[in-house]
Regions:
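Solvent-exposed, flexible loop/coil segments flanking beta-strands in beta-rich domains
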Residues: 1-34, 107-112, 116-118, 128-135
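Surface-exposed beta-strand/loop patches in noncatalytic accessory domains
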Residues: 3-11, 32-73
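Charged catalytic cores and adjacent phosphate/nucleic-acid-binding surfaces used
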Residues: 6-8, 44-45, 64-66, 110, ...
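Noncatalytic modules at the cell exterior or secretory-pathway interfaces
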Residues: 26-30, 78-102, 422-427
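Edge beta-strands of jelly-roll/beta-sandwich modules across compartments, strongly enriched
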Residues: 40, 96-109
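Beta-sandwich interaction modules
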Residues: 60-88, 95, 413-418
Length: 463
């Protein structure tokens, strides 16, 4: 065994451990120990190619990392390598350093034979894409989840069990800055690769990715706005970008990103977290402003689940669960690419209490996000029987509440004095007794509006 200790400070937060492997090992085992407070980002590089990432947060002070030739002998955030012979480098940087000196210890054990097995590493969900061609239409998912490989409390298997209990068809795994790529193999819930880019300027998800967001050659990649923008630009086309909890302090989104980069926005984030009621209301107001400016951003939800299923936050009256809220996406069949197509097409509904349904007597079933003809003016929103008593449906036309109802089935008609040849949009929000949105759908619309603003901060300044 080889053991190396590094002293890390706020002004010296970067380091690198290099070594060579000259024989045909079955596995390299790393054991990392740290002081508890900082976050450590580590990048595993083999012969100049990044093959893995590791995150140690304030929730851990130790992590075992298996670097193997197969999925089964590799840790969740490390892709297997055909051969381990060659030059290796473990680059790292620390953030959130409070003490004058922190310490990181890296211990390395080389296994020539009999590699250790990670019992939950069975399928590479980034490259071996899950699909279920028998699932079609409106499917239930979650776009914001965490495990023990960032700051969550659940294992991969526990996440899957919780998702099954919540009747999810799919979810995206979105650790902070790393990709949890290796998962247990099962057929009930599709798991797709993602990553929550976690920065001093807010958090944003990249959903349905085919490679990690961060490249160690540009480490750390987000310490200033210019570097963060470079990371975002480099990942255009690597899944889709979705801004997370835009008004949830201290993780609110502040970077003045071009809106052309953003496909969707998280409207409802973990509704059991104490500060999210106010943040949710602000997110919906921003969503209306974006649509009024002609930026038709898709609305989604994310549980941001960090806790065990039986745990809850202080002052919360219910546990924080994966699938709360759920996002329903209309797909041809369940594949990763079809889910992304559904988001880009704006065919989404978000709900905490069951699936809602939008119809029109002028057209029949309507897909959220659909551009409608001028003769479609009559709408009906159907809420499930599981809707809590006292919830209020608000119909919103161009950002203004135009009708309300407390019935499970509510209707709205656009009057003839409104010219639907012009640009208009319509959605309905379902609110609880405190006026906080619990369900919605991405608006339907008419006409076209060319945006005159181009960046995120411009919307905040102008509305």
């Amino acid at each position: 065994m080889v053991e190396i200790k590094y002293q890390v400070t706020a002004t010296n937060s970067f380091g690198s451990y290099e070594f060579d492997v000259n024989e045909d090992l079955a596995q390299i085992e790393l054991n990392l120990t740290t002081s508890l407070k900082p976050w450590y980002h580590l990048f595993v590089i083999h012969e100049g190619k990044q093959v893995g990432q590791i995150l140690i947060t304030h929730k851990q002070n130790a992590r075992q990392v298996l670097i193997g030739k197969t999925v089964a002998t590799s840790s969740a955030t490390v892709f297997p390598s055909l051969s381990l012979v060659g030059h290796w480098e473990i680059k790292f940087f620390a953030s959130q350093i409070d003490a004058e000196i922190e310490e990181l210890t890296i211990s390395r054990t080389d296994h020539l034979n009999a590699p250790l097995v990670d019992g939950e590493s069975q399928q590479d969900v980034v490259h071996e894409l899950a699909s279920n061609l028998n699932k079609t239409g409106w499917l239930k998912g979650d776009f914001h989840t965490h495990t023990i490989y960032s700051d969550g409390m659940m294992t991969r298997q526990a996440n899957l069990e919780s998702a099954k209990n919540q009747a999810l068809d799919f979810f995206v795994t979105t650790e902070h800055n790393v990709v949890t790529a290796l998962w247990p193999r099962q057929d009930e819930v599709a798991v797709y690769g993602g990553c929550e880019l976690t920065t001093p300027f807010g958090h944003t998800n990249f959903l349905g990715i085919d490679r990690p967001l961060l490249d160690a050659t540009g480490m750390p990649g987000f310490v200033d706005e210019q570097a963060l923008m470079a990371v975002i630009e480099a990942n255009q086309g690597n899944g889709i970008m979705s801004i997370n909890h835009p008004f949830l302090d201290p993780w609110a989104w502040t970077l003045d990103v071009p809106l052309a980069y953003v496909s969707s926005m998280e409207l409802i984030n973990d509704p059991t977290y104490r500060d999210n009621d106010a943040a949710t209301i602000k997110a919906f107001d921003l969503w209306s402003a974006l649509w009024n400016h002609g930026w038709q951003i898709t609305g989604i939800g994310g549980s941001d689940s960090h806790l065990l299923p039986d745990d809850k936050y202080p002052d919360a009256d219910m546990p924080s669960l994966i699938g709360d809220p759920a996002t329903y996406v209309f797909v041809e069949t369940l594949t990763r690419d079809n889910v992304l197509v559904g988001i880009k097409a704006k065919h989404t509904k978000v709900s905490r209490f069951g699936e809602i349904n939008l119809v029109s007597q002028d057209k029949g079933d309507i897909l959220p996000g659909e551009q409608l003809t001028t003769n479609v003016r009559n709408f009906e929103l159907q809420l499930p029987a599981t809707t809590p008593a006292g919830y209020l449906t608000e119909w919103i036309l161009d950002g203004t509440v135009v009708a309300t109802s407390t019935d499970l089935t509510s209707t709205y008609t656009i009057t003839s004095d409104i010219d639907l040849n012009d640009y208009h949009w319509l959605r309905a929000d379902v609110k609880d007794q405190n006026g906080v949105q619990q369900a919605t759908f991405t608006p339907v619309f008419w006409g076209h509006r060319q945006p005159t603003i181009t960046t995120y901060q411009e919307v905040l300044v102008n509305d």
